[in-house]
A protein has these predicted regions:
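Short alpha-helical
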Residues: 11, 26, 37, 64, ...
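Arg/Lys-rich, positively charged N-terminal/basic patches that mediate binding to nucleic acids
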Residues: 1-32, 107
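Basic/aromatic recognition patch in beta-strand/loop cores that engages polyanionic ligands
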Residues: 36-37, 41-77, 81
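Enriched for short, Lys/Arg-rich terminal
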Residues: 66, 70-107
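Generic structural signal for secondary-structure transition and capping sites
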Residues: 18, 25, 40, 44-47, ...
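Solvent-exposed interaction patches of small proteins and small membrane subunits
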Residues: 27-30, 50, 54, 79-80, ...
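Alpha-helical interaction segments
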Residues: 8-10, 21, 53, 58-60, ...
Length: 107
């Protein structure tokens, strides 16, 4: 099934466009074409990517961005499109608190 973007993922994509737009129309076009190609691939390859921060994670080739998604009834739901140059804490915070249930005991 075709991927669906959440409102937050759409906002992330707008931020990415804002970053690339001043660098030239061809750079922005290349980024958007690469992203569109990855969305086409995601339709066929959903669920094969490793999980990071509790979500499947797929890289966008040629650009330092990753697409974080979940599967709902075999439909990929894109939760975020994030710059890989963000630190791990910022990426994790994007998704809210992650609760760890299997904490080793201190005894």
């Amino acid at each position: 099934m075709a991927p669906k973007l959440t409102a937050l993922a759409e906002f992330d994509l707008v931020e990415a466009q804002d970053f690339y737009a001043p660098k030239g129309a061809w750079v922005l076009d290349h980024f958007m074409n690469s992203f569109a190609d990855e969305m086409d691939d995601l339709e066929r390859q959903a669920g094969i990517h490793p999980k990071h921060y509790g979500h499947y994670c797929m890289s966008v080739p040629h650009f330092p961005f990753s697409v974080y998604y979940d599967l709902e009834d075999e439909t990929p739901i894109v939760k975020a499109v994030l710059d890989n140059r963000f630190g791990p804490a910022r990426i994790a915070a994007h998704f809210g608190p992650i609760w760890v249930t299997d904490m080793p005991s201190g005894n």
